[in-house]
Structures are given as structure tokens and as C-alpha cells.
Amino acid sequence: MGCLACHHTDRCVIKDDINSIIDKLVESELIVFGVPNYFDNVSGLFKNFMDRLHPLYKSKQLKNKNVIFIYVGGGEENGTKKELHQAINGFCKYLSLDIKKEFSFRALNIDEVNKQKEKIKEILNNIKNMSSI
């Protein structure tokens, strides 16, 4: 919509569930985002979600909030992480989020991520360790 009404209210004026999602993000100690890679960028849906968090830009309610990103794409893991990090870095800069860790999965087919047990274990351990900070 791009109306910028949130600059005056610190809330989105669109009547849907984004304000309750924002409240949950603000209350969280740690935020974990799962981000698919489409054509070396975040998916359109995730980009829409990022844009809907615009009320948090001016209010800085997420300042220094710890964030973990989990990327999934069909290319090499490091390539996916590199490409998505660029888009995510700007998002985090403007919302003053603190990226604590980034993980990347290579997966093209349904259930391919679930077969990567060691990586899942590593991510869960990182989340457990961070949530005790």
C-alpha cells in the first residue's frame, strides 16, 4: 500500500493480522526467520512481509533484537547464503536487528531439508543457546 500512515501511529492501518504479528516480534527474545531463495533473492511473500514491518522502522521497537535466518534454495549453500544475505542485511539495518547467525540448506524437493539431520541439530542447538542469553 505504501501509505506511510504508520509513521504517525507506529501501527499499520490495514485491518489484518500484521499488528498482532508485530506485537509478537517485539515481545520475542529471539526471532528465527525461514527464507526461501527465488532467483537469488527472497521470495515475493517474504519481501511483502518485510515491507509490512515498516511500522517498526521509525519506532525502532526491534532495536538490537537477536535474529537467526535459515535460508533454503536449490543452489549451493554458500551461494544461497551470499545472495540472500545482501537483501536481508538491508532489512536488518533499517530495523536495527542484530543478525546472530545465518544457516543455509540446499533443497529442491519436498522433504529434502528433513533429511539433513545434522544441520537441523546444529540450528536447534544454536537457537537453544541463544534463547538462554
Question: Where are each of the predicted segments found?
Answer:
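Alpha-helix boundary/capping residues
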Residues: H7, L53, I127-M130
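Glycine-rich phosphate/pyrophosphate-binding loop and the adjoining helix
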Residues: S20, N89-I133
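Helix-loop-strand module that forms the ligand-binding subsite of alpha/beta enzymes
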Residues: V13-L95
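Active-site donor-binding loop signature of nucleotide-sugar glycosyltransferases
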Residues: G2, V72, F105-A107
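A generic structural signal for short
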Residues: T9-D10, E76-E77, I127
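A short, structure-level motif marking secondary-structure boundaries and short turns
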Residues: A5-H7, V72-G75, K117
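Short secondary-structure transition/capping segments
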Residues: M1, L45-F46, E112-K115
